């Protein structure tokens, strides 16, 4: 599907200018300067005159509580709300039930998100005192990082052993996102 978004105030690379954007499928294929409506064969045309056209937001720290705590929120409702607010991608935290601390739990979340999510997604894998080989061996293209709880929090994922912390800090090739207390 080829879409033309025309006449909007394009915000990109530190500048704002009136331009039109051509999107083919899910890829921006052209940016056309000026206020004239570009000619072409489009499946959909959006008049963005007077509106801002800008990149979507990436929310790198969400708690959608899915699976296991869905009385609070779930992937479908929260990703829908994210889309309405201009968030195009989210990274969900691992302190769910079950915790996302194994490759199997991570795979299950990806499979669930493929069915429920309205926007792009990824998931942090959580470190524990017992899963260092798993989190340091995870494919870095699958997850944005490793969540490390250094204080008690939802899900009781506290990593409190000095030997484990040393090994994690030494071996991790992914960014560590630490929840620090004390």
Each PLM stretch: what is its role?
Residues 2, 15, 39, 84, ...:
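Alpha-helix termination/capping residues and helix-transition junctions
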Residues 8, 21, 26, 50, ...:
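Divalent metal-coordination and catalytic microenvironments
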Residues 27, 33, 62-64, 95, ...:
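Short, glycine/acidic-enriched loop or turn micro-motifs at the edges of active sites
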Residues 45, 58, 146:
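Receiver (REC) domain switch-region micro-motif
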Residues 51-116:
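Metal-associated gating/positioning segment near the N- to mid-region
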């Amino acid at each position: 599907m080829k879409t033309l978004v025309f006449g909007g105030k394009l915000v990109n690379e530190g500048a704002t200018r009136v331009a039109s954007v051509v999107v083919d499928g899910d890829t921006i294929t052209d940016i056309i300067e000026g206020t004239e409506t570009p000619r072409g064969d489009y499946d959909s045309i959006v008049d963005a005159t007077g509106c801002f056209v800008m990149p979507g937001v990436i929310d790198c720290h969400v708690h959608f509580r899915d699976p296991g705590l869905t009385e609070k929120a779930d992937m479908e409702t929260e990703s829908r709300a994210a889309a309405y607010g201009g968030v195009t991608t989210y990274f969900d935290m691992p302190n769910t039930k079950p915790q996302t601390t194994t490759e199997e739990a991570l795979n299950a979340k990806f499979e669930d998100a493929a069915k429920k999510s309205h926007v792009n997604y990824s998931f942090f894998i959580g470190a524990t005192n017992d899963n260092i080989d798993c989190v340091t061996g995870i494919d870095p293209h699958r997850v944005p990082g490793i969540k490390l709880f250094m204080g008690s929090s939802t899900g009781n994922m506290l990593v409190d052993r000095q030997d484990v912390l040393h090994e994690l800090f030494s071996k991790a090739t992914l960014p560590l996102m630490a929840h620090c207390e004390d």
